[in-house]
């Protein structure tokens, strides 16, 4: 993985020094590859092994631990991931996470993807199941699981498997759980970061954007406020 991170740095240097055309390679492409690598190295090369220390595996362990602990009250959890959404063939993080949760003992029907609810009727049905605790783990992207996703009733934990582009997206994600109508007095938000990758840069970038927005809104220096 370190070798691949170095490869991204080399590519960035070539882009900065104008050694490659923007059509060949550019910072957006490099950043996207960096985000994929931070999520799971198999998104860069499906032949690479599953890293036991990956953040997806850390998330699986934490989700299962909370699922087990809150069995009696049937508390629910949300996993947000904008990259590597479910697909029919080839590797994707959604199916990988679900398969591992099922292997640990969670019934498959209790782990659902928002992407499978492709009509308003199916969506309403799915949201109802999350609210009553029939579905206990819901996975989705910011776009599909943001505004209008009212499933807060039993939500006890929310997991950020990747970092969205905008501060508003983080607020949108967290707002699914931290709102009126949640029966839990205490809730947890987990952010998963892969060391020595684009992850810390991405979260730092979003935090700085938020400070800048706050500065404009309040006309204050973010360092002083």
Regions found by a protein language model. Give the residues of each.
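A conserved SF2-helicase RecA2
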Residues: 165-174, 178-225
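Inter-lobe connector of SF1/SF2 helicase motors
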Residues: 1-51, 55, 64-65
